[in-house]
Amino acid sequence: DVAGFKTGYKSPWIAASLGVISGVIIGAIAEYYTSYDYNPTKKIAESAKEGAALTITQGLAVGMKSCMLPLIILGITTYVSYAVSGMFGIAMAAVGMLSFVSATVSVDTYGPISDNAGGIAEMSELEPEVREITDKLDSVGNTTAAIGKGFAIGSASFAALSLMVSFLYAFQPEGSQLELNFTNPLILAGALIGGALPFLFSGMLIEAVANAARKMVDEVRRQFKEIPGILEGKAKPDYKTCIEISSQGALKEMRMPAILSIIFPVISGFLFGPYFVGGLLIGATLSAIMLAIFTGNAGGAWDNAKK
């Protein structure tokens, strides 16, 4: 049912309100798992006393466990929104969650600003008390970034569901029932491959970070050898070259994942048909939601554990 208003004119309002409420709850869950005030991050800090291996293990555990509650909230919101207003209700839930977009973007930019402030304080050789203040601000910034990612992930999941239904209606014969039958091997194969795509993109991006970091390390070693007095604080390092390495690496390495994400569904549609693409969209959406929540919360918790 596309827009079956079960509760009359109030149906879209109820669905949009559910989107707002679910966004707030998902943000609170992200804060619990990433803020240094709560047990998950404190456990990672305790594990760090035993070595790097336990720190990584505990952080992975926190990230994985943090996926469950947001997905339950998203599932309940999706079901209730559909029950009161059909697929239009799911779209309205996405609109409700996106109503926070100005606040979430502002909150998300707080983290990098406070982090850079700490870097400036350290490079300017300010008093240790200044660095302590910026560290606390940076910790808050990590948490707010995780909260902002929660809103973005939730609204993106609702939007993806709405777009998926639009795709289904585009190829479904007129008058027939809208459905994706998972006994169809093409749909199942598409879902399996779609579930692997977010991991492929994530792997490519992580490898890109490693490549840029390797170039950065080589550049830092070169400067230590060729510019005497850096370690003693008598000479200034060449910051510009390091910044160019990181920015150029980020821009260049994003090209291939972006191209693949665009052409893969198109080529799959021409080769295997719309049912395969439908399964691909479902698998990629479900996998991407969980992977995004996991990586966002695990990274925020690790970053705050060192505070």
Q: Each PLM stretch: what is its role?
A:
Residues 1-307:
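Hydrophobic packing and interface segments
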